[in-house]
Amino acid sequence: AKGIDSSGGFAGLAAFSDVHVLLFPVASQLGPQWITSPMALRQTCIAEFSELGDLPEQQVVYRKADGVAVQQSLNLGWLFLPVKTERDWQQLGEIAQKIEVLGIPDYIISHLGVVSDKLFTHIVNSNLEVRTSVAIDPATGAAEEGALFTYEALPRGTVLFWEVTCRNPKHFKIDQQDVKA
């Protein structure tokens, strides 16, 4: 990157890592459920998650009992899974508390589900939004020939996380002058 008037330059003061999915919203008979997995949790900066192991059962969804009758099964998109609660896996309550520290809204935490890493991948890939777009010719206002395309997008309520590394501007100079930030 060049400085003002292209007299010198240096790399940016902020570096961004790849973005990862932490909580993925999926339609269910109970409304949207935000799904995560041990792998997604381990990738966060929360120290307690770094040692999180596999789930006791791989083909189930773990949900907090919310005071009403616990669903025996829950559909996550097209996938129909048995439901287990914190009675079956004590770490579920701790996970909800630790996620709350990240500033995640209570509504999302109350609709939290944890699935195995393998199921998480399938759930995310099967529930991406497919969007269709077309390029419009500005001269005619009509669609351009062969310009219809589709793409997959994350649903609007997806909770993402990434790391930002901020460098101290005092460690940089432009033309032997300190950087003012």
Predicted regions and their residues:
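Basic, Gly/Ser/Thr-rich N-terminal segments that form RNA-phosphate-binding interfaces in CRISPR RAMP
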Residues: 1-181
